[in-house]
C-alpha cells in the first residue's frame, strides 16, 4: 500500500491540474472537493497533496497557465527600456481577447475565475489569492502606463494609478460580459476596435488627468 501511494505521488501535476479544471468548470470551485479531483485524475488525494496543498494552489496554477503565453509582452510593456510600451500593451490585449475566443481551455479557465469561483467563508484563501493577483496586475499596468507617459505615448498629466484601475475594469468587465453573453459581443471580429476603445480612454479622457 505504501509503495502504491508513492507511485501515485509521482503523477504529473499537469494531470491533476487538468482534472481540477474539469471539476471546477462542472461543479464550481466551492462545491468541488479534492476527492472529486482525485477521482477524475485517477489518483489518490495523497498524490494531490504531493504537489498541491489545497484547492487554492490549484486555482493559482490555472491562473498562472493563462499568463504563460503572453508574459513576454507584459514584461516588455513594463520595462523602462521598451521603446513602444503602449504598442506592447495593445499586442497583449489583442492576444488576450483572441485566445479567450479561440482557445477552449483559456475560455474555460476564465469562466471558472469569473463565474464559478465563489468567495464563501471557507474560501478565504482563494479570495486573498485573487486580491493579490489583482494588485499584481494593477502594478504591471501602472508601470506600463508610466512608461508610455515617459515615451510621449500618453498625456503627461495622466493619473496612472486611476488609469490603471480604469483599464483593468474595462478589460475584466469586457471579458466577464462576453463569457456571460458571448452572442451579444463580436469580440473576435471587432477585437481591434475593443482594444483601441480602451486605449483611447487612456489617451483622451479628461477624467483620467491629474
Curated annotation (Swiss-Prot):
Residues 10-70 form the HTH tetR-type domain. It comes from the Bacteria. InterPro entries: DNA-bd_HTH_TetR-type_CS (IPR023772), Homeodomain-like_sf (IPR009057), HTH-type_TetR-like_transc_reg (IPR050109), HTH_TetR (IPR001647), Tet_transcr_reg_TetR-rel_C_sf (IPR036271), Tscrpt_reg_MAATS_C (IPR013572). It holds the Pfam family TetR_C_2. SUPFAM superfamilies: Homeodomain-like, Tetracyclin repressor-like, C-terminal domain. One of its GO terms (molecular function) is transcription cis-regulatory region binding. Keywords: DNA-binding, Repressor, Transcription, Transcription regulation. Residues 33-52 bind DNA. PANTHER family: HTH-TYPE TRANSCRIPTIONAL REGULATOR ACRR, HTH-TYPE TRANSCRIPTIONAL REGULATOR RUTR. Probable regulatory protein for the mepABC organic solvent and antibiotic efflux pump operon. May function as a repressor. This is Probable HTH-type transcriptional regulator MepR.
Amino acid at each position: 500500500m505504501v509503495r502504491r501511494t508513492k507511485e501515485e505521488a509521482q503523477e504529473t501535476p499537469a494531470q491533476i491540474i487538468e482534472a481540477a479544471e474539469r471539476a471546477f468548470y462542472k461543479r464550481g470551485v466551492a462545491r468541488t472537493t479534492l476527492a472529486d479531483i482525485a477521482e477524475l485524475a485517477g489518483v489518490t488525494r495523497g498524490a494531490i497533496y504531493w504537489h498541491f496543498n489545497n484547492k487554492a494552489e490549484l486555482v493559482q496554477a490555472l491562473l498562472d497557465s493563462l499568463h504563460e503565453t503572453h508574459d513576454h509582452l507584459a514584461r516588455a510593456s513594463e520595462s523602462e527600456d521598451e521603446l513602444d510600451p503602449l504598442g506592447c500593451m495593445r499586442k497583449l490585449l489583442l492576444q488576450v481577447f483572441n485566445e479567450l475566443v479561440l482557445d477552449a481551455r483559456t475560455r474555460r479557465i476564465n469562466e471558472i475565475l469569473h463565474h464559478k469561483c465563489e468567495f464563501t467563508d471557507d474560501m478565504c484563501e482563494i479570495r486573498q489569492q485573487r486580491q493579490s493577483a489583482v494588485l499584481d496586475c494593477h502594478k504591471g499596468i501602472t508601470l506600463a502606463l508610466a512608461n508610455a507617459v515617459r515615451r510621449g505615448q500618453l498625456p503627461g498629466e495622466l493619473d496612472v494609478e486611476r488609469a490603471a484601475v480604469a483599464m483593468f475594469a474595462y478589460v475584466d468587465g469586457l471579458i466577464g460580459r462576453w463569457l456571460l453573453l458571448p452572442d451579444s459581443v463580436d469580440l473576435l471580429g471587432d477585437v481591434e476596435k475593443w482594444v483601441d476603445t480602451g486605449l483611447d480612454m487612456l489617451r483622451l479622457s479628461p477624467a483620467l488627468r491629474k
